[in-house]
Amino acid sequence: MSDEEDYDIAGTLALAGSDSEPESDLNSDNEEVQDEIVSDEDDTKHKPNKKQKLEKGKSKQTFPSLELSDDEAENESKDMASYFVANNPQAKKAKNGSFPSFGFSKFLLTNISKKGFKQPTPIQRKTIPLIMENRDVVGMARTGSGKTAAFTLPLVEKLKSHSPRVGVRAIILSPSRELASQTFKQVKEFSKGTDLRSIVLIGGDSLEEQFSSMMTNPDVIVATPGRFLHLKVEMELELKTVEYIVFDEADRLFEMGFAEQLNELIAALPSSRQSLLFSATLPRSLIDFAKAGLTNPVLVRLDAETKISDQLQMAFFSIKNNEREASLLYVLQEVIKLPLASPEEVKRYSDMEKRDNGSEDEAEDENNNKKKRFKFKKERLPPANMLPSKHSTIIFVPTKHHVEYVTTLLKDAGYLVSYIYGTLDQHARKQQLYQFRIGMTSLLVVTDVAARGIDIPILANVVNYTLPGSSKIFIHRVGRTARAGNSGWAYSIVNEKELPYLLDLELFLGRKVLLTSMHEKKCEMLKTKQSSNYVEPKVSYTDRLVLGSIPRVDIETFQELYENILRNHYELSVVKGVATKGEKLYYRTRQSASQESLKRSKEILSTGNWDDQHLLFGPNLEKEKEKFLTQLLNRKSKETVFEFNKKGNDRDEDSLVEFMHKRRKQIAPIQRRAKEKRELLEKERMAGLTHGIENEILKNDGEIGYSGITIEADEEELQDAFEDADELIEKKKIEKKKSFRDPQYFLSHYAPAAVIQDQQLSLSSSFANDAAKATFDLDNDEKLNANKQVMQWDRKKGNYVNAHSTDKKFIIGESGQKIPATYRSGRFDDWKKQRNLKPTKTGAMEANATNGNDRRFKHKKVASPKLPDKFRDDYHKQKEKVKKAVDSGLKVKGYNKPGQKQELRSTEDIRKAREAKDKKKQKNARPSRKRK
């Protein structure tokens, strides 16, 4: 049997499990989470009573292998898999490096196969075996590498089933609401077929509903730190039963201001827990990770963090001041060739907006006061290996004000746009992301902070509206395209102030900046050298950072278009003013470029060639025009208007002519020296340029960048703080060969705890020193415009007070830190009293009545209709409703069938009854004792 025809254990198990499961189970899960736009693989249709067959030599379509091209030797992964296969008897027959080799249970392998996963990604191959060995792991891999499954699969395998004892067993903390929702969806899908109870706790949801969820005794909690701490303090939760805690996107957890919440939560966790930290980057804030209580952590780091895909092509467009908007419109329309929205698409988009806003869902029936809900067919998400749309593009902007500005501009230009920023409402986030993922909109405008955790598998293009201040942020941005072997483009708009950051990126990536003048000079040298055999070299947009400007004629056309849009839309001009102010604050807080790059950028700007027409647009048609203008500047006759047509005596007697003659004599030496200086600088520049190009030609390097530049962190320092995963496996293999010891029962005479303490107390090898080598910081644009003092009217005090005043009541938490006292408001106690619930104690056995199916109470009461009114248009319609209700057994107030006693009295009967009552009162009533 060849390698291509290997027996797929996971797929076989999945097929065996799917035959025995009814279709209703699959559909019920989809209905339960149909409003969560987080997964790509839920559009697989299951047909009952039909077995699926895998063709030989043809693999089933799987989730894209986003990391298979990483610099990871095959023998290393095989050694790692073989080691853990040897220790797990259930996985000895499984193929090395596959999911069954990790020792997963049958139900988990079935769920993995249903999700479409066939082979684990590199981060999963390295971390899952270590997590199964109960080691604390720090995992570093880029976005989209499968980090979520790397910690979710071991979680489900370890917990296996619901525990009858009260207490949370696993906690997953995410920095954003949408990321928490995505992780919760993954946990639900991988734990399908078990009785594990999982809930999600995010801000913006009802506290009462979350109280109900917590009372179901969940095993797994996926939450954001702020809301989880709120519930912990409000409900006085004990976390002594926690076995497994995950900090997802750990760098953002600390950078977004969750340090206070995390320190409070960490203090309440037991020391025997297993802690996992997963992130796309290693920022400066990792010094706080040492406080998280990791014990002898293992660092799993992939080399792809400082690299970009080989299929990614990049173009950098130089612009002048106030041309950024016009350049963006040109890139979208002429480079990406994104079509404008058709009337049908606009109508479809508006219908979806109305549906999501609830204008149609809340149409009220006038008669029975019940809400009528229109049924609609929810669009399916495309598979993970397909583009949401042909021209799907994500645009990165610096602040949320730019998101509003660019979104308004593109909508006015005729595009359908989705947008996401940090403070956007949770429902609006889901709605905007869903519209982009189903292809309703082709553009998504986001900030760097909001883009973290957004689950978009494949994109066609990435546009950097502004060049980021960090090279690693650039890699994070462009890493969202050119995945899974697909090609992609990244377009960046660069002005003079951002040129130093481009030069920093040149050094970071090891790819040289290529100007149009450099390419032309290279072509001239090759033409001279090769003569008749000359072939113009192709420009590599993957190995070079090609910089140039957009054609001047085209940019002027789009500049006029932008000015017309701005002139005709007042709202756009208002939003532009806000974005301009936000941009100033952003530039003020952005980290500066290196001094060497600043110096080099000034040299490039002085040459005047940095904004030549980009090589992407072919030959420069404006060059002939420029040559003609240059000839006019170099004409022999350089007379001014004062000397023109002045001849003979008139020329000699004119005072202005004499003045210009003297002026030329004075300026001539200065002009001569300036000309000599320019020629000398040009010779020096061309000498260096020619030397570099000649070296490339002689060495046949082509478009290769810097080969000697290294950007990796110091491995010696990292080894002092972490154990390397590969070395750990190799060490275990050697010990297994040479030693007779059984690792499960042998007690060593060494004291590893003391060694760990010595390493932690060492000043030269600390976690903070290691983390400082690889930094990646995102500026939180939400806090840029937060003034230190904002005066607000206090109605109780009757005067203005500081809105950000620290005059608040605090309570001391378990960590000794002060936390807001508003967390403990007594709402849970009131909620519990209303339902007569008894207090539960962590560790005790749960009550049998505890319901963990996450199903809400549904009202099934049928109300009787109102009586028909003869003076209304719907009299006959309402009469039929009343008749049907009476026939079904309902009692309609005031309605009697023919022959029954009339319960309602007429106005004449009421009048007669009142007259009889008055007569009786006059006859029998006693006189009043009150004084008149």
UniProtKB/Swiss-Prot annotation:
Transmembrane stretches, start-end: none
A GO CC annotation given for this chain: nucleolus
Catalytic activity: ATP + H2O = ADP + phosphate + H(+)
Chain positions of motif DEAD box: 248-251
InterPro entries for this protein: DBP10_C, DDX54/DBP10_DEAD-box_helicase, DEAD/DEAH_box_helicase_dom, DEAD_box_RNA_helicase, Helicase_ATP-bd, Helicase_C-like, P-loop_NTPase, RNA-helicase_DEAD-box_CS
Annotated Basic residues bias: 919-932
Biased amino acid composition, Basic and acidic residues: 349-358, 867-877, 900-918
Keyword Plastid (UniProt): no
Keyword terms, alphabetized: ATP-binding, Helicase, Hydrolase, Nucleotide-binding, Nucleus, Ribosome biogenesis, RNA-binding, rRNA processing
GO BP, one annotated term: assembly of large subunit precursor of preribosome
Main localization of the protein described in the UniProt heading: nucleus
GO molecular function: ATP binding; ATP hydrolysis activity; identical protein binding; RNA binding; RNA helicase activity
Database matches in Pfam families: DBP10CT, DEAD, Helicase_C
Localization: Nucleus, Nucleolus
SUPFAM superfamilies given in the database record: P-loop containing nucleoside triphosphate hydrolases
Limits of the Helicase C-terminal domain: 369-529
Ranges where the record places region Disordered: 1-74, 349-375, 860-932
Enzyme class: hydrolase
Motif (Q motif): 97-125
Domain Helicase ATP-binding: 128-300
Annotated positions binding ATP: A141, R142, T143, G144, S145, G146, K147, T148
Domain notes: The Q motif is unique to and characteristic of the DEAD box family of RNA helicases and controls ATP binding and hydrolysis.
Family label: Belongs to the DEAD box helicase family. DDX54/DBP10 subfamily.
Protein name from the UniProt record: ATP-dependent RNA helicase DBP10
